[in-house]
């Protein structure tokens, strides 16, 4: 027997082991007809899943965000069924069909058919037919050999591969059936196909089986799904807006960065204008960190093999590292992280308790292997710069340090115009290193730091890394998307591996606390987010060109040059458009280049020593003296105002 506490009823029940949510709902005499699934001990289940353990059960309805997982998983199966009905069961071979943040996809092989976006409406119509038929969705289990035989008969080679390599011997093999369609799956799924909500298929792309280039290329069909048509419409409108804000297009149009296949995928080159943005961000970062007591360091891009063995990267992270280099009979690796170097800086001399806290900070370039299909502009790259820092401190300093770091992170992100955050606290997993007391101190300090900000936060219970708990901060952009930025992470692993210690007041050795933290996460990615958040119209202090001077005619060039020199003397980034073009075209081109200020100069301005100021987001122009304009723009730059 098992005991289940049903949160919706605030009551505990005793059931036979193996009972399903469907059975439980029947026992409640139809009181909860709108339930689409449940959450048992934090794990999403459907109405068909056998319950074999005691715990807390929460019913999931459409208004619960977690219920979308059930909807989207079911729609992946409905799409797979539609493909088989359109192109023939024997011609369609299914790979995997998981959910995504906003929908689902399925990887398939279709003999004799290469899908394009033009095929999607036909697939959608077939899916709607399946939904309308209201097939009951049923779960059943097969013994391992029977399951393999079943899929061999259907020529489902990828399902057989999953059974043989992903499902351990002795573990139940579950399948789901709707109509004549059967798929290997753990769930969760809806009670029937007619419970499905609003959806849209959005794209087709290639995807290697298991993500390996040596495996067959499958076709991946993406869809998005929500419970209501309004939610779907709002999301599709957001996607259209996101296309206009694509940082890859903005970067090309504004000549900010370059990713050249001759150099290598995922390796960004900063062009002069993009380099200005990056330098401004890095300079502000360094200034703020020095003000807060950090010590700036620089470390090499490569390290000896032994370093990565000691750190554990070669045991746990090697698949994300680039291959070993042989130099003078010794192995070297380009660094995927800066941490071991900072540890060695700490260990370069004996440390006393009086020195703490030690805060080491670096804008360190790291290299991590990403599959070519995962690369995406500046958002997913192979070489990037982390705004990395490691704080090494005593136990009595932990709480203050965490509070200070979180304060730094939030204030920094706010200074770039972000004011909506989602904060997550990830706690101790089942398997972990370090002692329980250190975990307790760390988790309490993280929790108190978040609560001191007044922000709501979500707890990912057991979601911490094996080496320490952490805080993650996500920012919401102008069109409502969330982006992972700041991480504050305890590490109980590296201090042990590298035998880090300090001499305490008792003249004995003690193990320090070590905190990893990054504010942006990646400079490249953060700039990509900024470009999309502002649609290229960056705050004036970040704009590569802050002012464009537009002379009305050639006779005004001499005065325009005088204005330019005055601005340059005041460290204002300015360009003079001396092309033989009409003024309206020059203005339009400056707008397309997202330049925040235009100064139009003609006879009147030359005679009076003024400029006609056209400011982004404002109608018409304002006449100011050169000094007045310089004073105005310098104040905007200094205060980091957003126009």
Swiss-Prot record:
Broad class of the protein's primary localization: cytoplasm
Catalysed transformations (reactions): tRNA(Thr) + L-threonine + ATP = L-threonyl-tRNA(Thr) + AMP + diphosphate + H(+)
GO molecular function, one term: threonine-tRNA ligase activity
Annotated region described as Catalytic, given as residue ranges: 246-539
InterPro entries according to UniProt: aa-tRNA-synt_IIb, aa-tRNA-synth_II, aa-tRNA-synth_II/BPL/LPL, Anticodon-bd, Anticodon-bd_dom_sf, TGS, Thr-tRNA-ligase_IIa, Thr/Ala-tRNA-synth_IIc_edit
Residues annotated to bind Zn(2+): 339, 390, 516
GO cellular component terms, A-Z: cytoplasm
EC number, UniProt record: 6.1.1.3
Enzyme kind, highest EC tier: ligase
Pfam families associated with the record: HGTP_anticodon, tRNA-synt_2b, tRNA_SAD
Sections of the chain in a coiled coil: none
Domain TGS: 1-61
Keyword vocabulary terms for this entry: Aminoacyl-tRNA synthetase, ATP-binding, Cytoplasm, Ligase, Metal-binding, Nucleotide-binding, Protein biosynthesis, RNA-binding, tRNA-binding, Zinc
Needed cofactors: Zn(2+)
Cofactor note: Binds 1 zinc ion per subunit.
Task of the protein: Catalyzes the attachment of threonine to tRNA(Thr) in a two-step reaction: L-threonine is first activated by ATP to form Thr-AMP and then transferred to the acceptor end of tRNA(Thr). Also edits incorrectly charged L-seryl-tRNA(Thr).
Protein family per UniProt: Belongs to the class-II aminoacyl-tRNA synthetase family.
PANTHER family: THREONINE--TRNA LIGASE, CHLOROPLASTIC_MITOCHONDRIAL 2, THREONINE-TRNA LIGASE
Protein name per UniProt: Threonine--tRNA ligase
Organism: Sulfurihydrogenibium sp. (strain YO3AOP1)
Gene this protein is translated from: thrS
């Amino acid at each position: 027997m098992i005991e289940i506490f049903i949160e919706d009823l605030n009551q505990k029940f005793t059931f036979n082991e193996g009972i399903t949510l469907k059975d439980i709902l029947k026992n409640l005499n139809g009181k909860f007809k709108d339930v689409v699934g449940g959450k048992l001990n934090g794990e999403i289940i459907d109405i068909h899943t056998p319950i074999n353990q005691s715990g807390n059960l929460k019913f999931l309805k459409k208004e619960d965000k977690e219920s979308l997982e059930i909807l989207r998983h079911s729609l992946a199966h409905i799409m797979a069924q539609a493909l088989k009905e359109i192109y023939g069961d024997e011609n369609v071979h299914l790979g995997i069909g998981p959910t995504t943040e906003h929908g689902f996809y399925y990887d398939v092989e279709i003999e004799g058919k290469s899908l394009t976006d033009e095929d999607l409406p036909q697939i959608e119509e077939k899916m709607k037919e399946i939904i309308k038929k209201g097939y009951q969705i049923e779960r059943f289990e097969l013994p391992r050999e029977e399951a393999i035989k079943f899929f061999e008969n259907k020529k489902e080679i990828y399902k057989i591969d999953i059974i043989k390599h992903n499902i351990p011997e002795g573990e139940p093999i579950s399948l789901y059936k709707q109509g004549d369609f059967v798929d290997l799956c753990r769930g969760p799924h809806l009670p029937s196909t007619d419970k499905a909500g609003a959806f849209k298929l959005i794209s087709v792309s290639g995807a290697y089986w298991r993500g390996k280039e040596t495996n067959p290329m499958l076709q991946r069909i993406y869809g998005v799904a929500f419970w209501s048509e309004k939610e779907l419409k709002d999301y599709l409108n957001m996607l259209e807006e996101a296309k206009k804000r694509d940082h890859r297009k903005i970067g090309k149009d504004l000549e900010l960065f370059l990713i050249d296949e001759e150099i290598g995928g995922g390796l960004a080159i900063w062009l002069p204008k993009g380099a200005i943005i990056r330098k401004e961000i890095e300079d502000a970062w360094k200034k703020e960190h020095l003000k807060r007591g950090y010590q700036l360091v620089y470390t090499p891009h490569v390290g000896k093999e032994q370093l990565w063995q000691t750190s554990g990267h070669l045991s746990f992270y090697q698949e994300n590292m680039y291959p070993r280099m042989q130099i003078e009979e010794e192995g070297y690796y380009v660094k995927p992280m800066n941490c071991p170097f900072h540890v060695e800086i700490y260990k370069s001399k004996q440390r006393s308790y009086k020195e703490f806290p030690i805060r080491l900070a670096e804008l360190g370039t790291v290299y991590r292997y990403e599959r070519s299909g995962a690369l995406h502009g500046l958002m997913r790259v192979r070489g990037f710069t982390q705004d990395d820092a490691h704080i090494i401190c005593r136990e009595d300093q932990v709480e203050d340090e965490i509070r200070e770091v979180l304060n730094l992170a939030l204030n920094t992100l706010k200074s770039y115009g972000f004011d909506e955050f989602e904060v997550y606290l990830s706690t101790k997993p089942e398997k972990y290193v370090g002692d329980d007391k250190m975990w307790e101190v760390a988790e309490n300090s993280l929790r108190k730091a978040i609560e001191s900000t007044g922000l709501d936060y979500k707890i990912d219970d057991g979601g911490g890394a094996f080496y320490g708990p952490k805080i993650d901060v996500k920012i919401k952009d102008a069109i409502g998307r969330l982006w992972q930025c700041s991480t504050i992470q305890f590490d109980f692993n590296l201090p042990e591996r590298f035998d880090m210690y300090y001499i305490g007041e008792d003249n004995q050795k003690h193990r320090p606390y070590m905190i990893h933290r990054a504010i942006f996460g990646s400079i490249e990615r953060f700039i990509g987010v900024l470009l999309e958040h502002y649609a290229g119209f960056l705050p004036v202090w970040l704009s590569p060109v802050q002012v464009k001077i537009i002379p009305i005619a050639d006779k005004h060039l001499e005065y325009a040059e005088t204005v330019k020199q005055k601005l340059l003397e005041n460290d204002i980034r300015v360009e003079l458009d001396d092309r033989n073009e009409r003024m309206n075209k020059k203005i339009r081109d400056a707008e397309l280049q997202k330049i925040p200020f235009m100064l139009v100069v003609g006879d009147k301005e030359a005679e009076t020593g003024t400029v006609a100021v056209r400011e982004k987001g404002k109608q018409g122009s304002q006449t100011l003296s050169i000094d007045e304009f310089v004073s105005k723009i310098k104040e905007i730059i200094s205060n980091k105002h957003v126009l």
